[in-house]
Amino acid sequence: MARSGRYKVKFRRRREGKTDYMKRLALLKSRKPRVVVRRTNRYIIVQFIGFKGEGDEVIAYAFSKELEKYGWPYGGKNLPAAYLTGYLAAMRAKKAGVTEAILDIGRFPSTKGSRLYAALKGVLDAGIDVPHSPEILPDEDRIRGEHIASFAEKLEEEGSLERQFSDYLRRGADPKIISEAFESVLERISAMSNG
């Protein structure tokens, strides 16, 4: 690999594709806490991170698996779960004194209306100021899960609802009423965070 004196080995996290150091430096120059949104194959993670000389400090944290404690039976990777996770993390960050932040989506592609921006919408609706473009946020109908409910109704007419939503149905969650469940979980998060 490094056979001559002119070859420079990149940082390990850059080689692994985990960190874009130029983007990280630009975010740190803002001197604001970062809203770090990460998605896995099953969950959404939202963290408020502050910079310290010896390393980053986690100010507040929310993981979409925590939504089960608030009565959310619909899994942790869909758009409504991303919104609720962002909202929960922002409520915790407000308790810690955060009023503004800057978004860090890492090396994920910036796609309009994605789960990453649904989490950002949850942070914004909780009252934390984050610079953003309003066009990038998903529609209110998608945030409440109405696209999932309409798709479930269409599949029920075709007779293939059990095949597509087997995980929800196994947990006793009806995908056609996801919007009502979203509203009740949002109220519970607001009540527990304010109370």
UniProtKB/Swiss-Prot annotation:
Q: Which NCBIfam families does the entry link to?
A: PRK08569.1
Instruction: Output the InterPro entries linked to this UniProt entry.
Output: Rbsml_uL18_euk
Quaternary structure annotation from Swiss-Prot or TrEMBL: Part of the 50S ribosomal subunit. Contacts the 5S and 23S rRNAs.
What are its GO biological-process terms?
ribosomal large subunit assembly; translation
What name appears for this protein in its UniProt entry?
Answer: Large ribosomal subunit protein uL18
The species is Korarchaeum cryptofilum (strain OPF8)
Name the family the entry cites: Belongs to the universal ribosomal protein uL18 family.
Q: Which GO terms describe its molecular function?
A: 5S rRNA binding; structural constituent of ribosome
HAMAP family membership:
Ribosomal_uL18_A (MF_01337_A)
- Gene symbol of the encoding locus: rpl18
State the function annotated in the UniProt record. This is one of the proteins that bind and probably mediate the attachment of the 5S RNA into the large ribosomal subunit, where it forms part of the central protuberance.
Q: Which GO terms describe its cellular component?
A: cytosolic large ribosomal subunit
Enumerate the SUPFAM superfamilies for this protein. Answer: Translational machinery components
